[in-house]
Amino acid sequence: MIEEDKTIKNFYSGQITVFMLMLFMIVSSVLIAQYHSAVYYACRADSERAGRLSVDSLLAGYVKPLKERYQILAFDGGFGEKEFSQEKINGELLDVYKKNIQSSVDKKNIINSTLDESLFTMLIENDWRFLLREITLNRVEFVREDGLETLMKMLKDKNNEASDTLQEERQEAERASQEETSESEEDKEDGGNEEKEHVDDPRDIVTDIWNRGILYAACPGEYQISDKECSMGDVSYPESGQEMQGEIDFKDEESIQGMFKKWDNIFDSDNMLKGTVEDAAAVWYMEEVFHNGTTHLKDSSDNYERVLEYEIEYIIAGNEKDEENLKSVLWRLLALRCVMNLSHILLSPEKQMQVTETAGVIGAALVIPYFIGVIAFLLKATWAFAESLSDCRALLRGKKVPIIKSDATWHLSWERMLSLNVNMLDGYEGNEGMTYEDYLKIFLLIQNRNEKYRRMTHLIEKNIRLQNEYSNFYLKNCIYGVQVTFQNEFSVGENYKVQTGLSY
């Protein structure tokens, strides 16, 4: 009986031992699993933290002059070299990642880390989205609807109207010439004895002034023209520029017709910028950070060195010489002003009468009375052109010129036109209307957006390269955002991928 009790006791004791052993194993397994889980999540948190710090560290190395001068944040993916270096960027990302891992509490539990994949958002994409985001920040609210499309349509219509009027006057003169009956020899002899009234033809004077060069004609006498020149062949997005057109003969209707045709392209609505509010805000940005032909008239603390002085003019025209860019912009400005000034003359009975009287004297002197209509129109075009030269000179002196002039804002009287010299083109002291910079905005707003932004990047690159440490700077290499994936091997036998991204 006693032996039987011992057997039963030993049996139950063995069962308890097995149960306790199993319980211990279960508890140990749970604890080990919890430990592994704790280690895994701790390593995971450290890995994610290291990933964020890695991309933070990379983008913190933005190009300082790009931020200071042009308010643009971007990282140079070329590291001061011409070519983009993804390998070097990946190495820097991984190096910073590993250093942050080593500084973590669970560094011993992260056995190995590698960079699995890196993707970059470039500052300059096809739609200019990220560049525009940077340069239009806090400027969009200042952009308003200025009725630009209406203005350009009006200019185009008036330019076409002037061209059509000249064509009609020419056709009428030719018809009158064909219908003119032959005079008798006696009438001719009698007419030949008549004393002809003489008048100086202002067309000769304006033609002479113009054909000495647009800078001579349209710049005030004291204006100092920049002689800076910069090759743009080594920029990220090179392209060719546009130069000013040739001579004009104000006594030749075909020459004037050619002038109107060239101007028609400037006012072509097909070239009109039909972009977003951001595109318009970008024009205000350009005015703030780039110089133009009147910047020297302002008090400015900006002492940055620049490859060109007429930067806005370069964006509009794209030539490598300041002088050529100024010529091209003045040509556009003359087109706009001349069309509007001619419209004013055609709507002024007093001015029309003055011109017609002079045209009659010139026609009589030339014995071509049936061409008086053509001569009168050419005189009106000449007057409008001379007034436009005066407008350009005033604008370059920091004065204002209204889009549509009145008798009160008109500078050159017809009496002055009949005795015109180049010095008379100066003296307009306009204080109402638009400044030179305002007219530049019009040209920028109607310019092709890709052309405009490419040329803007040319100036940014070339100006930054003037600093020795950025001599090989290229905007095409600049990164705006990064997305990276790191592969990690943990001591608990798990692998974990960290994916993180950041942009400016």
Q: Language model features by range: what are they?
A:
Residues 64, 72-504:
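Long, compositionally biased low-complexity segments
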Residues 2-84:
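Alpha-helical assembly-interface signal, strongest on the long, hydrophobic N-terminal helix that forms
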